Swiss-Prot record:
Protein name: Probable peptide ABC transporter permease protein y4tP
One MF term in the entry's GO annotations: dipeptide transmembrane transporter activity
Superkingdom of the source species: Bacteria
InterPro entries the record matches: BPD_transp_1_N, MetI-like, MetI-like_sf
Organism: Sinorhizobium fredii (strain NBRC 101917 / NGR234)
Any one GO biological process: amino acid transport
One Pfam family this sequence matches: BPD_transp_1
Membrane topology: Multi-pass membrane protein
Lineage: Bacteria, Pseudomonadati, Pseudomonadota, Alphaproteobacteria, Hyphomicrobiales
Keyword set, alphabetical order: Amino-acid transport, Cell inner membrane, Cell membrane, Membrane, Plasmid, Transmembrane, Transmembrane helix, Transport
Cysteine disulfide partners in this protein: none
ABC transmembrane type-1 domain sequence ranges: 95-300
Family: Belongs to the binding-protein-dependent transport system permease family. OppBC subfamily.
Length: 313
């Protein structure tokens, strides 16, 4: 196990190095100039050139990359080119809404998705199974922002049951915090519920056809014990993989969802940074997301040994 973890850590360093190079080049080669955005539409070429020099954008790309990479290795992710506020400080101010939305979405997606998939497999071809097929088709095909606007129209504008937009900190009360997160959470959960449910159903169907499941039924095991003690445990590896992938990919959905519901989280910060060509913010967020994705994959691989003792590294 120790050798495997060490090998994965070494490969992680290599992956993060390549990701850093790709992110740096992608932003630098993309259209747009942060100096021109800062200077404004009425600025002269000399003013833009002076700002580029202040930001170090007039240096060769290899030199810019070395400066940026060395700062990152020291834990210095720079400051916003517009506000001058350190990037980590900006992220810490936006962290609570994003974490709240992500955690609630993951809880809802896993709970409903796994339960839906188990029931669909247990009654394959029945009403629940057909309902899952319909729901999955909708969840896969309809964009997150469309789902968000539909929910806003029915549950916020027409019925006025829930807030339309915005966010209330949990420090100001659990009830308003939760009410403001219901619509964003449901919106972001729809595609992940569909994804997790379909994979759970397929994995459960494969396990339910095994001989030991028929043996358990012959011994008088209850349906609950057969489903959740025997079948779900043995079907857990692909389900855990899907949950890990869903959590890692959720960041992209968070950006759209926070924009639709005007949630002041990291997603909104990234959108504003892209509009303003604020390189330090974009680079930092992309690097942190990449690191989180790699870490989640490592944790999922290690969790396999807890679900299935036959797996050894």
């Amino acid at each position: 196990m120790g050798v495997y973890i060490l090998r994965r850590l070494v490969s992680t360093i290599a992956v993060m190095a390549m990701v850093g190079i790709f992110i740096f080049l992608l932003l630098r080669l993309a259209p747009g100039d942060p100096a021109a955005v800062i200077a404004g539409p009425t600025a002269t070429e000399q003013m833009v050139a002076n700002i580029r020099e202040e930001l170090g954008l007039n240096e060769p790309l290899p030199v810019q990359f070395v400066h940026w990479a060395s700062d990152v290795l020291r834990g210095n992710f720079g400051a916003s080119v517009f506000t001058g506020v350190p990037v980590l400080q900006l992220l810490s101010q936006r962290l609570e809404p994003t974490i709240s939305l992500s955690v609630l979405t993951m809880i809802l997606s896993v709970t409903v998705g796994v339960s839906f998939g188990v029931l669909a497999a247990w009654r394959s071809g029945g009403f629940v199974d057909r309902a899952l097929a319909t729901f999955s088709a909708i969840g896969y095909s309809v964009p997150v922002f469309v789902i968000g606007y539909i929910l806003i129209y029915f549950f916020a504008i027409q019925t006025r049951w829930l807030p339309v937009q915005g966010y209330t900190s949990i420090n100001q009360g659990v009830a308003p915090w939760f009410l403001h997160l219901i619509l964003p959470t449901v919106t972001l959960s729809v595609p992940y519920i569909a994804f997790i449910a379909r994979i759970t159903r397929g994995s459960m169907l494969e396990v339910l056809s095994e001989d030991y499941m028929r043996t358990a039924a012959a011994k008088g095991a209850s349906p609950f014990a057969m489903l959740f003690h025997h079948a779900l445990k043995n079907a857990g590896v692909p389900i855990l993989t899907v949950i890990g992938i869903s959590f890692a990919y959720m960041i992209g959905g968070v950006v759209l969802t926070e924009t639709v519901f005007n949630v002041p989280g990291i997603g909104r910060l990234v959108v504003d940074a892209i509009k303003n060509r604020d390189y330090p913010i974009i680079q930092t967020v992309l690097v942190l997301i990449s690191g989180l994705y790699v870490l989640i994959n490592l944790l999922v691989d290690l969790a396999y040994t807890l679900i299935d003792p036959r797996i050894r590294y």
